[in-house]
Regions:
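Short, charge-rich binding segments
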Residues: 46-48, 56-59, 105
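Gly/Ser-rich oxyanion-binding loop with an adjacent helix/lid
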Residues: 2-24, 30, 34, 39, ...
Length: 386
């Protein structure tokens, strides 16, 4: 098992001077519901998962970081006062976290490190956030007397993406990786950044990701267009309701009133977002009553909205969603920005093997390749293991 301390430790010992350091881990995440709501000031509902990154870190008494990626069998060194980030993209994350921690007053010194992960790259489980959180947590512990609070650690990861990796992401992935809690999902208000834990211990159900292994190249331009649609709808609504800042402040009635000033396409996009923000709240209410049937129903509604109104699904994901429905799966939807990636499924224990078998078989028959299946369990956030 990759996430075992011994797995990383044996390679750390072999690669460096035979001594051992401290071991840290951080998880990837799922988002149960609340998709494309973050940039509309709404809610997201992530949870940390039992897959992630694990790293051994040991100060080396120099000003140089020596980093080894166990998975890629790649080695990089950089000085802590160098301005230029390393070329290897994985090393940029570590470099960026070092710079961001130094900016926040942590006296980071050189260290040796080796890391590995079992968050699959590209399946939308935020492997990069897991890597950032692992090192932010480690540097805070080893060099910062743990004086940087958890929220700031999440921001370190976000700033790393922005400043060193060219990704203009929100805070959700890093937040979930740092604040994750076993058996709980986190409702995060993307405007105020207030958060609340909700119990998620679905007895008799399993949470399964089915990865379509497709990535459609449209994604970034389409994503920007969706944002513009939302902004256009807000601008039209503001004429009558000047206090409105985001679609989060709107209901369907306000959108209907402004219909004449909104293009048909922008109207559909806004309708999806307004409904999706409400669905997050409905799912939280359902979880407080352990009503997983309602949770599942809302997941299907989200998929329908993402497919028909927001139009960010694709043939493969719609196929997997229909298949889940036909198998009697409790809930299923596309997870992440869309245009590929995976579906997240809430499956009754007794249906599990039938569903997985069918998903593999039918998908392969139609698309001539096999989907990947990942079972996930909601787990703890960034921590020191030993």
């Amino acid at each position: 098992n990759i996430m075992d301390i011994e797995y990383v430790r044996s390679r750390f010992i072999k690669h460096f001077d035979g001594t051992t350091g401290a071991v840290y881990a951080s998880p990837g995440r799922i988002n149960l519901i609340g998709e494309h709501t973050d940039y509309n000031g709404g809610f997201v509902f992530p949870g940390a998962i039992d897959k992630g990154m694990i790293a051994e870190v040991k100060p080396n008494g120099t000003n140089t970081v020596k980093a080894y990626s166990i998975d890629l069998k790649d080695y990089v060194e950089f000085g802590l006062n160098e301005e230029d980030a390393p070329r290897a993209s994985w090393a940029r994350y570590i470099f960026g976290v070092c710079r961001e921690m130094i900016k926040r007053g942590v006296e980071v010194k050189g260290f040796n490190t080796a890391f590995a992960g079992d968050v699959p790259l590209g399946a939308g489980m935020s492997s990069s956030a897991a890597l950032e959180s692992t090192y932010a947590y480690a540097l805070n512990d080893l060099f910062g007397d743990n004086k940087i609070d958890k929220f700031e650690l999440a921001k370190v990861g976000q700033a790393t993406e922005h400043n060193y990796c060219g990704v203009n992401c929100g805070i959700m992935d890093q937040f979930a990786s740092v604040f994750g809690k076993k058996g709980s999902l986190i409702r995060l208000d993307c405007r105020s950044l207030e958060y609340q834990y909700f119990p998620f211990e679905p007895k008799g159900y399993r949470l399964v990701l089915v990865d379509s292994v497709v990535k459609h190249e449209l994604a970034s331009s389409a994503y920007n267009k969706r944002r513009q649609s939302c902004e256009a709808a807000v601008a039209a609504i503001q004429k009558k309701h000047p206090h409105v800042e985001f679609l989060r402040d709107c209901n369907m009635e306000m959108l209907e009133e402004a219909k004449a000033d909104i293009s048909a396409e922008d109207f559909m996009r806004a309708e999806y977002v307004i409904e999706e923000i409400q669905r997050v709240l409905d799912v939280c209410d359902a979880l407080e009553k352990s009503d997983y049937e309602t949770v599942g129903q809302k997941m299907y509604e989200t998929h329908h909205g993402m497919s028909k109104l927001y139009e960010v699904s694709c043939e493969e994901l719609d196929f997997l969603n229909d298949l889940a429905f036909d198998c009697g799966v409790t809930g299923s939807r596309v997870m992440g920005g869309g245009f590929g990636g995976c579906t997240i499924n809430l499956v009754k224990e007794e249906l599990y093997s039938t569903f997985i078998e069918k998903a593999k078989e039918e998908f392969k028959k139609k698309f001539n390749r096999s989907p990947k299946i990942y079972d996930v369990v909601i787990s703890d956030g960034a921590r020191r293991l030993e």
